[in-house]
Amino acid sequence: MINLNININTPFLFHNYNTVKVNGVLTDTSDKDVMDLFELSTEYFKRYADLYLKFIACGYLIDPRIVFDDESYKFLNEEVYDNVNCNYNATFYKDWSDIISKDRFELLIDQLLHYLSTYGTNYEGSTYIPNNCPEEMVIEPSKFKNLKVIKASSLKSLSDKFLDILNTPIALSEQNLQCMLVCIKNLWMCYFAKNQIDNDWLKKTINNIKNKEAKIVLATVFNITFDEPTDVMRLLWYISTGNSQIIQSAKGLSEFVVGLDDNSMARIVIGDYLTHLSTDELKVLSSVYYRYKKIFMFIKNRCKYYNMEEVCTAINKLSRYAKTYHKPMQVGFWEGIINMGWDKQPTELYTKMIEDTKSGKFSCFKAIKIYNSASEKLELVNQHKDGVIKEYDNCWSLYYIRNKKFYVKNMFMRDLDCSDNTIKSLNNIKYACLYYIIKHIRQYLTDNKIKYFILPDNINYTLPASEKNFIGSVPMWSQLDMSKSKHNIVGVYWRNEWGTKDFDLSAIDDEGVKIGWNASYTNNPDKPAVIFSGDMTNADPEAVEALYYRNYENIPNQIVFNNRFNGNQGSKFRLFFTQNNVDNFGRGYMVNPNDIIFSTDIISDVEEQMLGIINDNKFVFTSINFSDNKVSETSYRIEALFDYCKYNMNGKLKLNDTLDYLSDIVRIVSVDEFNKIKEQDENITDDNMINFSFNTLTKDTFINILK
């Protein structure tokens, strides 16, 4: 959202007063809304003109309000420009006809010659590729309306915006959360230095933050204590591990113990915290003693080893108090409603939603999550009732766990309750959630005087249940219609300096047939609908692998993977998607940068990541850490994902699902139509419109209407 190193699709730059960079971004040094260009020096115009010409050729426009001091200019000119200046034709072959014209043996010979020049020489010789002079294409002037803007912002305005996000009950990705916290911490530190922050205000503000991870980090920095026992445990865990999420697995507990052993300050701070708790505070904390007993035992064990007897005494007291004050962990009403059911009217459930919203226990994001669960289960039940899914057919459920991983649960349809009462209950839950979401969005549109949506016709957006449910700025499970274009390309771009030399893009269809470096390069030699661009094993200076989909009526259902064959965990690559309808496509090149409708940087956390699913001529955006395999291969989990798309995808709540209920207050228009409306009515401005086009889309576009 803010860090160019994370996502160039939605860049923001800021400069932290006298500090050039905070997590790789810049801002103007004042809080002025508009900079008086006539008072600026000649040097400013030279620097702006230089950056303008460079960035516009890459599809980016620089906000003139950015202050171009020496260090800011250097950062933009080197780090940022280097990040956006890339050649998407750094492919193995020069154009797609080079692949079609060769049989698999000829392609293999090219592969082997390439491997000999990279792995065979331990990367010490020159790399052989048939495309020894990649075509460099620039952004055409006709595409300037699709430019992405690198904006300027003051640290204060960003911090206020981020604090507003943290005060909403939405889960955030670790990277964006850290960016937000850096901004907020730096601003508050500046205010502290000027004695402008009241301690009581600070404690109240941090305690009211709804994002649990952010609350813990800020409390640690500013030495704030908590009343809630679960918050206390998160704080202790964070002090030892640096991670605010408690994971009581063998690996997680091992990291906790290592933190206590390696960091004497962590032991001292945790020990000091526990020994200074009053009797009443110990009784409150003992209510979660059994839930976190392993953690307390490890603290006691290590403190005993380091002769911290007072800490051991405090933990012994917790153990005694727990016999009286222990509170079993209970599943919340909303967390268990799908299994519990709801046999009353949807209006009664909606009333409870409103009540819990006021107390912070319910939100639009939770309503979306519950709606999706109820709707997906209802889809399965209805498919079974209609005879599409038989009694002994497999029924798959996907559960997301931390770090973008997922767990597949298999059961037979006969094990699923398909009674009329279940159908009624699921419908009641679904309708109540939808009504709540519609009312919430309607209120936002009315309050902000939004009258128009600019919505592309080639994408069907899902509504996100959290900030983690995005790929770049596109919500996960959104569907891009490939039938709108004759030519579709899914590709990955990377450089050695980003941490990996060899990424492998591939696709496996619903019959287990693979397209990729160790399989066929096409799905059909005579009339290929899918073509693989070739295997690049050295990104010096850069590399691209791509899958070209044409003749959309023949596109097979596939899952698209990217595997890290030779590289480091935490390295990155850039996922991009192009669409084009020209007749002479791909002559002398493979990728036209003017056709890129979407791109985002993705961190390679595991060896194998799933980038998307092609189902019924639609590309479904996903970002799932699939496995630790260096090479993609068919498995039962691929079968599960295809079945999930076949039977469950329609259950996801889409943005379009809400528009029928909002047509009386908002109108869907194109960019040109909206510009004409503005010309005809001087009271209509950009503030009366929400633009869902790819080039302007940010996570905030969705989050703002839902938070």
Language-model-detected regions and their locations in the chain:
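Intrinsic-disorder/low-complexity signal
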Residues: 1-252, 258, 262-264, 273-274, ...
